[in-house]
Structure formats: C-alpha cells, structure tokens
A protein has these predicted regions:
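Acidic, glycine/polar-enriched metal-coordinating patches/loops
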Residues: 635-638
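C-terminal functional modules
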Residues: 43, 364-564
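Short boundary motifs at domain starts and secondary-structure transition points
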Residues: 89-95, 263-266, 601
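Aromatic-lined carbohydrate-binding surfaces of glycoside hydrolases
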Residues: 102-274
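Catalytic-core regions of glycoside hydrolase
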Residues: 76-79, 104-105, 194, 200-204, ...
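Short, Φ-rich (hydrophobic/aromatic) sequence segments
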Residues: 12-15, 70-72, 78, 349-360, ...
Length: 653
C-alpha cells in the first residue's frame, strides 16, 4: 500500500524492527478485499501472522492504527531485544461506529494535560470519539457561546484537535446555546458563525446540546429548525465534516411525557444523531429502552451513558466495573459515549470497560474486564488497586436512586458476622475472613502510591488516606467485638476507645478534604464496609453504656426531607454546622402546583432563616422568610411540630 498512515506506521516501528534487510520478516499492508458489512466499518482490519510474513488488510487508516495497537499488545520482547509474536489470524471490527466519552459533567473541568492524556488513552483503547462539552466552559455555553475563544483557549483547542487526529479520535466540539438563545435569524447565524470559528481551529465534528434547560430554548420544533439549518448550511457544505450530533432536552425516558421526541423524529434531518441517557438520567442501558426511544426519534439513538460520572455524589469515587450494558443492543445505537468523573485518570478503570463493550459486546465480560483494567491502569500494584477499586464503587444514596454493587467479594462474610453479632455471638470464621480483608485494605494505599502515575495518585489521595483508616478501623472493630464477648470490660473499653479514635480520624478527613459546595467529604466502602464498622462500634458502645434504649431526641441525629416531589425524595441533604439544605440538582427541577418541599431536624436546633434559590424559575419566585413577612396574604409556612423534632413544609403554588 502506498502512503500508509504515518501514525500507525510509527506504532508498528516502535513494536517491530522494520528494515530493508531481505532476511527480515516481511510486512504487507493492503486494502481489505473481504467487503462483508462488518469489515466495511471504519476501524476494521484483518491481521495474519505466519512464520513467513505479517499481513495487515484494512478498511481505512483507522483500521491500520488499530491493527498496530493489537500488534503492540501481542508483541513480547526478551532481554536481548528480540521481539516475538504469536502466530494466528485476527479478524477485528467494532460493534458500534462511534465509541468514546463526552466531557459533560458538572464540577471542575479536566485540565488541558488531562485531555491530552485521555486522547492518547482512547487511541490505545480503540475509542474514536471525544465530545468536548464542559459545563463550566463559558464559550461552549452561556454567556459567551456567541463569541470566539480567547487566544490561549483557542490554541489549546488546536492542540486537542491535533492530538485527537494522531490517535484517530474525532474531536467533537459541542455548543450549548439553550439557556439564552433567541429563535431569531441573528442567533441562528451566531451558531453558524461559531461553528465556522471552530472549523478554522481545525474542528471537523460538531454537536449541539439542549440538555438541562427549560423555557423558550426547550422547544422541539425550534431546535429542529436550527439543527436542520446547520445540517444544510454547514455540515453538508464544509469539507470533511462528520455527522451532526444533538443532545435533546428530554434526553431520558422519565422526562419524555410530551410529544417532544416525536416532533424531533418527524422533523429532524435523518442524518443527525440524537443522544439518549436511558430510562432516566442515570440508568443502565437496555435493549428495550433503546427500542422504545428509537421508535420515537425514528433512528438509532446515540447513547450518552452517565457512568462513571460522579457530579451527583462528589464525596465518592466510582471505580467499579462497567456493567448494566445490554450485550444485544449494538444494532439499536448509533454511538456510545460515557460521561466520566472529573478525575480523569481514575475514570480510566470504567472507560477501559466501556471501550471493550462498544467494540465487541458479545465477548464483553464486566468482571474479568475490570481485573484487566486495574492491571492496565496501575501495573505496579494491580491487586492492591483492585482492592481499592472494588470497595469504591457505589455512589451512596442519591436523588437518581442509582446504586452499584460494592465489596461483593466480602458482603456475605460481613453479613454473616453481623448476623451473629446482633445475637450477641462472635462468628470466628467470618471474623477471620473480614480481618484478612481489612489487613489488605490497610496495606493497599501504600502499595498503590508506588505507582509512577502521579496524576492518578493526586486525584485519589484523600480516598487513599481514608481507605487506610477504614482498614485499621475494620481490624479494630473485629477486635472490639471479640473483647466485648468476654468479661474484661477494661479491655473492651480500651478497644472501643481506640476504634472511636479511628472513626474520629475518618470524620476529620471527611470534613477536611474535598470540601466542594455540594457533596462534601471523602467516603469509602460506604455500602458494606463502613456500615459494618459503624454497627459494631454502635453495638459495643450501647452494651458498655447499658443504653440500648436511647432518648428519642438523641436518635434523631440527622435532618431529613419532607416532600412529594419525586426528583427531591431521594436527594441527599447538605448538612453543616449551622445550616441544612437540599443539594443542588444538576437537572431542571419540575414542581407541579400543589406540590411541597420541606425539612425536619432536631428539636434542639432552631431555624433563624430560610433561603430559596430558584434561579431558572419561569415565574421568578425566589423567596426568603422575609418575603412571607412582607406579603402576609401569601400562605404561611406549615408547621408540623412533633415532640421530638421540628419541621417546616412549603407548599408551591
């Protein structure tokens, strides 16, 4: 083949010693003659390794690049620098055309260095799509989406486009105009002109996001008109531009109560991709759910999977396997991108699985893939890293009611121990198993910190500190439970106080690190292991104090939510020393007339003020307690006082 892709050839030269020596193993690169539908896909290749030669047949330059990645994975080099390859035939092609990530999370955006490293990672993982849509980029969204990027940011965009191309990744630049767009010819041209500015920076793939908005910008017919205009006047006229992508306002099934999706299906140009998160904002991806939306939008949807994104549980890391993905859904999606965490390096564990799923669904196994991901991301200490990751999987209670399996290798032993502990018995076998686990947890952070990947260590450092303390607390909890079975109360007290000190240290870390405005703190092992330790601590403490029946006011130690609004029922509260409140929702909150929301809290605390922040409310009802005092004809707060608590409920008219 004349002029094979230089990026791919560079990889092959790094792997094999390519020379003009007639005795060297020949390398032959040709175009694929087998034109079955699968091998016509971008990225498809046929790799044949025999004692006589290496044959690579490709569908396109991306296919050669992926074949080169496979050669790197297969090659083994001995101490003398000799490279060996296994003999065989590999016929390889992707199940999904567009595979990768969407940087679409709330919170701190990735750094430029993060993005460069991610693009290199995607190339190695055979992912071909990166959608740039940081929520906090004012030139992607309001207020500056109409304006050009400043010089520094424009130069960074150019760098990203270049790095993406070198790794055979489409850099997709997304615009988010819906917060303040006017459906006028002027603003239509503003979007078109901004696309032109990005084209001049080298961008060849584009998206328009209308997610998480309400009001005028959320009208399906107006959105479709704009997108069809962009399709005709930009996508079809500019050279080398990829298909246009849009994220709709009703991007999940739970919100699809109107004819919005049907309007898009009828009026939107069929060449435009439509994104979809599943049956709710954060949800597993099912074939049934895909077929449901595809009928509405009259095309295969482009999956935006909200995992391992953690902008709704920022005190947790989501380091577990990428499961909950239907292996039979390839035909029902046009693309598959995952929304990662703001911690780019830590996200690689889940993204490793996403890449394998989207490439070959039938062969994908989340559990074995997870083990491989831990080995890939942290080869210096893969077992210690696996221990850390499999105990940092679950987001905890959240408004989306999306939970993940955690500590599954140890959950049975933990429950067996606690079952007997509740009966005032000590299960020595379960204790031994849990002790070994907590010893592994105690040692894991030190092993992990030997990694050369300092960016990863910096991202997860507070959780490593907390994980180490959890291991020590777990060992001490089991020791405390054991001494509590005996007659030596002094020894039990000593062990109990040591455990209390460790839990206090964990609380200090939780209140010191990662103090973001939303879900503050550092949680580890929150589904199985931390509750295990806390239950033992509480149980032994109650026995020591002869206080099994505590005062009702003491039992109510936390504030809680009172509401009939489905979006708020499961939303965690933000609780500090002098305030409690609802955590901010990333999505639009929909409140129907007559619905209410409120709080309940301890009797010993007195409320001095109430603050409402509804910045996007169409009727602009932003109220504080002073509003009620100034407007006596408005309904007063409904007091639902009980002997043990105070609570306030606000009806919404």
């Amino acid at each position: 083949m004349q002029h094979p892709d230089e990026d791919a050839m560079r990889l092959i030269r790094q792997t094999l010693s390519i020379t003009d020596n007639s005795e060297a193993l020949p390398l032959k690169i040709t175009s694929l003659e087998d034109r079955t539908p699968e091998l016509k896909r971008s990225g498809a290749y046929l790799l044949v390794i025999t004692p006589e030669e290496i044959d690579i047949a490709i569908s396109d330059s991306r296919g050669l690049f992926y074949a080169a990645q496979t050669l790197q994975q297969l090659a083994q080099t001995d101490g003398q620098g000799n490279t060996t390859l296994p003999l065989g035939v590999i016929k390889d092609y992707p199940d999904v055309a567009y595979r990768g990530t969407v940087e679409g999370f709330y919170g701190d955006p990735w750094s430029h260095t993060d993005r460069i490293e991610q693009l290199r990672f995607y190339g190695k993982m055979k992912m071909n799509t990166y959608i740039y849509g940081p929520k906090d980029d004012p030139y992607h969204s309001s207020p500056n989406w109409r304006k050009p990027y400043p010089e520094k940011e424009a130069a960074q965009i150019k760098d990203l486009v270049k790095e993406a191309a070198a790794n055979k990744v489409d850099f997709v630049w997304a615009i988010h105009p819906g917060l303040d767009i006017k459906w006028t010819d002027e603003d239509r041209m503003n979007v078109l002109n901004k696309f032109g500015m990005m084209y001049d920076l080298g961008v060849r793939s584009f998206a328009v996001f209308f997610d998480d908005i309400s009001g005028e910008g959320a009208k399906a017919d107006k959105q479709a008109d704009l997108l069809n205009f962009l399709q005709k006047e930009f996508i079809e006229k500019k050279e080398g531009v990829s298909p246009l992508i849009m994220c709709p306002t009703e991007y999940n099934r739970a919100w699809a109560g109107s004819d919005y999706l049907d309007v898009l299906g009828r009026t939107l140009d069929p060449a435009i991709h439509v994104m979809w998160t599943g049956n709710s904002v954060i949800h597993d991806i099912t074939l049934e759910g895909q077929e449901w939306v595809n009928k509405r939008i009259q095309r295969p949807s482009y999956v935006w999977w909200n995992f391992p994104v953690s902008d709704y549980c920022r005190d947790h890391l989501l380091m577990g396997p990428s499961y909950g993905l239907d292996p039979n859904a390839a035909h029902a999606m046009s693309g598959f991108v995952a929304n990662p965490m703001e911690r780019a390096e830590a996200s690689k564990v889940a993204l490793y699985g996403v890449a394998d799923y989207a490439w070959n669904m039938k062969a994908y196994n989340p559990e074995s893939d997870f083990v491989e991901a831990c080995r890939y991301v942290l080869p210096e200490a893969p077992e210690a890293f696996r221990t850390f990751c499999e105990n940092n999987c679950d987001p905890g209670p959240n408004g989306h009611r999306y939970r993940r399996d955690e500590s599954i290798r140890y959950a049975e032993s933990a429950e067996a121990f606690l079952h007997d502990f509740r009966q005032h018995n000590y299960n020595a076998d379960a204790a031994d198993r849990m002790n070994r686990l907590f010893a592994e947890i105690t040692a894991a952070p030190a092993a992990i910190e030997t990694s050369r990947n300092k960016a990863l260590i910096d991202e997860i450092k507070p959780w490593l500190m907390q994980f180490h303390l959890l291991g020590k607390a777990g060992q001490k909890a089991i020791r405390t439970a054991e001494t509590g079975q005996g007659e030596d109360r002094a020894a039990t007290w000593q062990s109990y106080l040591s455990l209390t000190s460790l839990l206090d240290s964990m609380r200090t870390i939780d209140q010191t690190y990662n103090q973001n405005p939303y879900q503050k703190g550092v949680k580890v092992g929150s589904r199985v292991l931390t509750p295990f330790v806390q239950e033992i601590h509480s149980g032994v403490g109650s026995n020591l104090l002869f206080a099994d029946q505590t005062d009702a006011a003491t039992q109510m130690s936390k504030a809680s939510i009172l509401t009939d609004i489905e979006q708020l029922k499961y939303q965690p509260l933000k609780e500090g020393k002098d305030q409690i409140g609802y955590n901010r929702l990333n999505e639009v909150l929909r409140i129907e007339p007559g619905q209410s929301f409120g709080l309940t809290w301890e009797l010993q605390k007195e409320a001095t003020s109430f603050n409402f922040s509804l910045p996007k409310s169409e009727n602009r009802r932003r109220q504080t307690m002073d509003d009620y005092r100034r407007h006596p004809r408005r309904p007063s707060p409904l007091q639902i006082g009980k002997a043990r608590s105070q609570s306030t409920l606000y009806p919404y008219a």
